[in-house]
Amino acid sequence: MAKAKFERTKPHVNIGTIGHVDHGKTTLTAAITKVLHDAYPDLNEASAFDEIDKAPEEKARGITINISHVEYQTEKRHYAHVDAPGHADYIKNMITGAAQMDGAILVVAATDGPMPQTREHVLLARQVGVPYILVALNKADMVDDDEIIELVEMEVRELLAAQEFDEDAPVVKVSALKALEGDPEWTKNILELMAAVDESIPDPVRETEKPFLMPVEDVFTITGRGTVVTGRIERGVINVNEDVEIVGIKETKTKTTVTGIEMFRKLLDSGQAGDNVGLLVRGIKREDVERGQVVVKPGTTTPHTEFEGQAYILSKDEGGRHTPFFNNYRPQFYFRTTDVTGVVTLPEGTEMVMPGDNTEMSVKLIQPVAMDEGLRFAIREGGRTVGAGKVTKINK
């Protein structure tokens, strides 16, 4: 069969499985690919369980994560699905954003109900901004008593409500193992789950539809033409002759106009999210702009020095610190393209943070950085990554 080309016609949605270890996340991922392959063979290839379980290593912000990516299609949508086998891999993925999720399937074994990691994953999903969660009650073939299933469902709904997720989210009874074995009744339930995913996870807002932002990677002067700032457009679209602001690092913002856009030495009328471009900016000297600033649509992004974040601290084995850190820890915070020193305040009741822990922290930076809630950062000491995190709240 010819390899199907990537169709742009369908909405593309990133999802993942979350939940307690051994509740069947990876089995469910394999079952979804098999059932969709059997139902729509022209749209899907099947992925074997052992391929998904041997999750390849990836690096995100200097942290190694084991994570599997599979893709599949329903009639309505194209999905990229991430599954991380180990609990630590989940936490690292959610905090570093190696694989962003537009929505998640929370897998809860009907035999156990919500467990500590179930709660932790839902809490993290809230903190890192996963927009929507629905539920697969797995191993439902092993519970004969409907009352037990109803109790588990109630517990899961309470857990979602406690973290401000939709407590009326779909809860679908499944047996991933039975569906993998081809049992028709349980196969039908997987299709029901995917119909719920199609319906309940909202279409994501694509990066091109957001306001323009480009981190500055380099600045140089072209004789006779002026100053060019280069970088990869993070979001939005920029057109020639549009006004922009350059913000961050310095006390004041700089207003200017983009008079030219270049990509691969060709002149363009516009650039969009994902493009590596050079922007020719009017009336700006080379020394007015530096790496670490961002070029933005006027009024859309502001620089800040104080924020709260959720961070994962590398273990010694991962190349992180060998010792814990305490209040007033002063590492560098690497945002987009540059390091800025910051002072860490730990939450009340937390005396120290050990390598391998994840923690909340308040940070005060010595220079302002253009940021929004949800921005990712690395924590570094002398250029070596010792942690990664995400801004959960801006304080100043």
Swiss-Prot record:
Which reaction is recorded as catalysed by this protein? GTP + H2O = GDP + phosphate + H(+)
Q: Where is this region: G4?
A: 138-141
Residue ranges of region G3? 83-86
All copies of domain tr-type G, residue ranges: 10-205
- MF terms (GO), sorted A to Z: GTP binding; GTPase activity; translation elongation factor activity
Specify where the region named G5 lies, as residue ranges. Answer: 175-177
Q: What is its main location?
A: cytoplasm
Q: Tell me which EC number(s) this protein carries.
A: 3.6.5.3
Which residues are recorded as binding GTP?
A: 19-26, 83-87, 138-141
A Pfam family assignment: GTP_EFTU
Relate the assembly described in the record: Monomer.
UniProt lists the family membership as follows: Belongs to the TRAFAC class translation factor GTPase superfamily. Classic translation factor GTPase family. EF-Tu/EF-1A subfamily.
State the protein's name. Elongation factor Tu
What organism is listed for this UniProt entry?
Answer: Rhodococcus opacus (strain B4)
Q: Which gene encodes it?
A: tuf
